[in-house]
Amino acid sequence: MTAIIDIHGREILDSRGNPTVEVDVLLEDGSFGRAAVPSGASTGAHEAVELRDGDKGRYLGKGVTKAVAAVNGDIAEALVGLDAEDQREIDMAMIDLDGTPNKSRLGANAILGVSLAAAKAAADARGLPLYRYVGGVSARTLPVPMMNIINGGEHADNPIDVQEFMIMPVGAGSIAEAVRWGSEIFHTLKKGLSQKGLATAVGDEGGFAPNLASTRDALDFIAASVDQAGFKLGTDVVLALDCAATEFFRNGKYEISGEGLSLSPEQMAEYLAALVKDYPIKSIEDGMSEDDFAGWKALTDLIGGTCQLVGDDLFVTNPARLEQGIKDGLANSLLVKVNQIGTLSETLDAVDMAHRARYSAVMSHRSGETEDATIADLAVATNCGQIKTGSLARSDRLAKYNQLIRIEEELGDMARYPGAAIFG
C-alpha cells in the first residue's frame, strides 16, 4: 500500500528568484508528499553538488532542468515500486544510482527533493505529521531560534564582513513567545535604523543590511534594540554570530577589510574571544575557514568551553567530516543543512553522530528558500533544540516559524521549549 507509483519533478523559483527543484511523490494508497529544495549563497567547498544547467541563455545559467530530468528519468525508474516507508533503501538506491562521492551526476538537489518528498508521502500514509513520523513519540522539543536580524558578508552589500548577527530568545517560555519577542526586537531595530538614516531594506534572509562601520557597531545596535524593546540582554535574549569566515580567508589570513584588519588564525581566535568577553555571544558559527583545522583547534581550545562553536562549512552535514572533526577536537556543534549532504538518511546520521559525541546540533535553512517548511518538522523530529531560519520578515522564513507554532500547539502540554538549557 505504501509502494511508490509516481515521482514527478518540476522547476520552480526560490526566494531569490532563482530556479530550484520541487518533487511530488505519489503512493499506491493515494498518499502524497511534496518537497522543494533550498539553495545557499555562501557554500562550502565540500558540500554535495547542486546540479545547474549552465545555459547562460536561460535563467543566466541557473536553470535546473537537468536535475528535474534526473528526477523524472533515472530516479523515478529506479524507485517506482519501492516502499516509501523504507527511507534508507530509497536514499541508498539514489546514492548508488548517482555513483559519485558528491552526488554530482544526478545532483544533490534532485536526490534531496525525492528523499524528502518520499518521507512526507510515507508520513501521509501513516496519518502522522512529519515530525512525529521521523522522530517518533519522543519528538517534542521545540527549537530555540537564531534570528538573523542584521546581515553582512555574502548576504549584504555593506562593509561588515561577519555574515549574520542573530538574537536568541532563550528567556521565552514557548516558541510562540520567542517568535513574538523576535518580532518586537526586529521592529524596534528597524525604527532605530530609520531614525539614524540607515537602510531598512531586508536581505536574503529577512535581516537588515545597514551601512554600519564594524562588527561591534552592529552588536551595539542590536543590544540597544533589545533594551528598547523591553528585554534584558544576556538573560532574556543572547546573541549569536555566523562569521562565514571561509569567505574572507585569503592566503592564510582573515581579511576583515571593513575594519582594515588582516589577522592570522591565532589573532582571529583572539578577535572572537574579545567579542565573547564583551557581549553575551553564546554561539559562533564558522569562526574559522572550512579547511583551517589549526585555526579551528585554536578557537575551540580558547573559547569552546564557554561558547557554542558551530561547524557549517567545516562539516557540511557530512558524517565523515564530522567524525574527523570530533576526533580532532574541532568545534562543539553541528549546523544541519539537508541540501549539504543530499538525503534525509545521511542528515539524520549526522545529527545522531553529533549527539553521541555530545556536540549540539542546529537545524538550518539556506539563503535561497521556498515556502517549504520541512526543516521546522526536522528540528522537532531530531530534538536538536535550535533552529536557524532567518529573520522576522519574508514569507519564506516565516513559513518555518509558523509551522513551529502549529507544532507546539499540536503537542500541547507535551511541548518543551528548552530556552537557555540548550547551552548546558
From Swiss-Prot:
- Required cofactors, per record? Mg(2+)
Does the UniProt entry include the keyword Isomerase? Answer: no
Gene Ontology cellular-component terms for this entry are: cell surface; extracellular region; phosphopyruvate hydratase complex
What does this protein's record comment on cofactor binding?
Binds a second Mg(2+) ion via substrate during catalysis.
Pathway terms, separated by semicolons? Carbohydrate degradation; glycolysis; pyruvate from D-glyceraldehyde 3-phosphate: step 4/5
Ordered alphabetically, the record's keywords are: Cytoplasm, Glycolysis, Lyase, Magnesium, Metal-binding, Secreted
Q: Care to name a GO molecular-function term for this sequence?
A: phosphopyruvate hydratase activity
Which Enzyme Commission number(s) are listed?
4.2.1.11
**Which Gene3D superfamilies does the record associate with it?**
Enolase-like C-terminal domain, Enolase-like, N-terminal domain
* One GO BP annotation of this record: glycolytic process
Protein name, as recorded: Enolase
